[in-house]
Design a protein with these regions (language model features):
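Short glycine-/acidic-enriched loop or helix-start segments at secondary-structure transitions
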Residues: 25, 77, 107-109, 133-134, ...
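Residues that act as N-cap/strand-start positions at coil-to-secondary-structure junctions
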Residues: 51-53, 160, 179-181
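Active-site neighborhood of phospho(di)ester-bond hydrolases with catalytic His/Asp-centered motifs
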Residues: 67-70, 94-101, 123-125, 174-177, ...
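Metallo-beta-lactamase
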Residues: 88, 92, 116-174, ...
Length: 219
């Protein structure tokens, strides 16, 4: 099995990249110190930088091809290229499921004004939609206006409530905090379980320093 793919019971998960930028860990975690980060040499790169990852997880479950989040679509974004290299083709995607609606999770929703995944339904957590579409929030959220609201005009959105059953093996469970409507995806198949966490945590270092919260957390 390729290193970018794992199975959880009958469910196949394929990790797809949209890029691996580096940055100072003090940018997302301004209340920490470089000395604290140096306690985790396996996380550190040159010049006291840490790696980041944009991308998606492709999931095959119950005869469906599902994409969890759609990356950032920066100028140097590679999501489409990496998907095709790993045998994941946009025109075959049945469902696009969002853990939340931050810019680096909705970037490839549309291409040239049309849904990037043409036959897919786009599943959005209802609570996150309610938050991001508030007038006082959406006016400052260009990514919502450009990459999320047009999906409604295309008629491809479905909303997920609490414990939303995506397939018999996948459930969207509420994990608020990073955003008010954030969800994680529980995979439960053939006695095996795993989670696609979304942005519940941003670094393995948070398992040690459990009080570290990145500036991106809304709550």
């Amino acid at each position: 099995m390729p290193s970018y793919s794992i199975n959880v019971g009958n469910v196949e998960l394929v990790s797809v990249s949209d890029g691996f930028p580096t940055r100072s860990p003090l940018m997302p975690f301004p209340d920490t110190t470089i000395e604290q980060w140096r306690e985790f040499p396996e996380l550190m790169k040159e010049n006291d930088q840490i790696g980041s990852r944009y991308g998606t997880t492709a999931v095959r479950s119950g005869g469906k091809l599902i994409i969890v989040d759609t990356g950032l679509q920066a100028a140097d974004g590679i999501l489409m290229e990496d998907m095709k290299a790993k045998g994941v083709h946009p025109e075959e995607v049945d469902l696009v499921v969002f853990t939340h609606l931050h810019p680096d999770h909705v970037g490839w929703n549309l291409t040239a004004g049309k849904p990037t995944f043409p036959k897919a339904r786009y599943l959005i957590p209802q609570r996150d939609w309610d938050y991001w579409t508030k007038p006082e929030v959406v006016k400052d959220a260009e990514h919502i206006r450009n990459q999320v609201l047009p999906l409604k005009d295309h008629g491809v959105i479905e909303f997920m409530g609490d414990d939303y059953q995506i397939t018999d093996e996948l459930t969207a469970v509420s994990t608020p905090g990073h955003t008010p409507g954030h969800v994680s995806i529980l995979i439960d198949s053939q006695g095996e379980r795993a989670y696609i966490l979304g942005d519940v945590a941003h670094s393995p270092a948070q398992a040690h320093y459990t009080d570290w919260c990145p500036i991106f957390d809304v709550e």
